Amino acid sequence: MAFTFKQFHIDDFGCGMPVSTDAVILGAWAPLSDAQNILDIGAGSGLLSLMATQRSNAKVTSIELDDTAVNACQKNFEASPWTSRLTVKHSSVQEFSKQHQESEESLFDHIICNPPYFKGGTQSQNRLRAQARHTDTLDFCALLEAIGSLLAPNGTASLILPSQSMSEFGLVLADSSLEFSQVTDISDSQRKTPHRHLFTLCHKSTDASAKPNEGATEHFCIKELDGSYTEEMKLLITGFYLKY
């Protein structure tokens, strides 16, 4: 399916994970103002990479495991105004991380990822969709290990996960080199409990005074009770959706 945003166009035909509200919210929310070198893990059609390029002056490297998605991503990049700042690589994040360390290339000051989160259970009959949504090819431990090795010392990573995955993610995170620096709970409406969580990660600090405020959790509501977007949602997506 094709989607036209204010400054770019996305065709996600053949991609396991189509354009979603979750991805748009993550791409618009991630703190990118000072980023110069961004990594998009599991780029899919390239939506997050294109949003990051629109919102910053950074160079963006996108890694994607599936060859069909890589082709779609490359075409979307070539059709955008920022071709010179966008690069897509056909690779798993594990292999990319290994090669990146061996080549001693610069680390990334921001990493963005809409990760797979289903563990076990019945998978979609669509192989690409199953790969994009299930942790079989990229579990939380492997993801956090890769982010930890690719993220610059003062860098930040931005992710989004459903509520049912946060407990397991938190347990894995506790044993990693990273920690939460910001968490925003997302609700569909004021009457519904949070169903998604945006968060940023940073390297753990040994300086207690420099530790992030782990108790600070913000809240974000997508829709009013009548089904229309809230003002905060409109403000978030105003640079992307044609209607706003």
UniProtKB/Swiss-Prot annotation:
Organism from which the protein derives: Shewanella sediminis (strain HAW-EB3)
Compartments, as annotated in UniProt: Cytoplasm
Catalytic activity: adenosine(37) in tRNA1(Val) + S-adenosyl-L-methionine = N(6)-methyladenosine(37) in tRNA1(Val) + S-adenosyl-L-homocysteine + H(+)
GO molecular-function term, one example from the UniProt record: nucleic acid binding
Swiss-Prot/TrEMBL GO biological process terms: tRNA processing
Family stated for the protein in its record: Belongs to the methyltransferase superfamily. tRNA (adenine-N(6)-)-methyltransferase family.
InterPro entries: DNA_methylase_N6_adenine_CS, rRNA_Ade_Mease_Trfase_CS, SAM-dependent_MTases_sf, Small_mtfrase_dom, tRNA_Adenine-N(6)_MTase, tRNA_adenine-N6_MeTrfase
EC number: 2.1.1.223
Lineage: Bacteria, Pseudomonadati, Pseudomonadota, Gammaproteobacteria, Alteromonadales
Protein name: tRNA1(Val) (adenine(37)-N6)-methyltransferase
Record's keyword terms, sorted: Cytoplasm, Methyltransferase, S-adenosyl-L-methionine, Transferase, tRNA processing
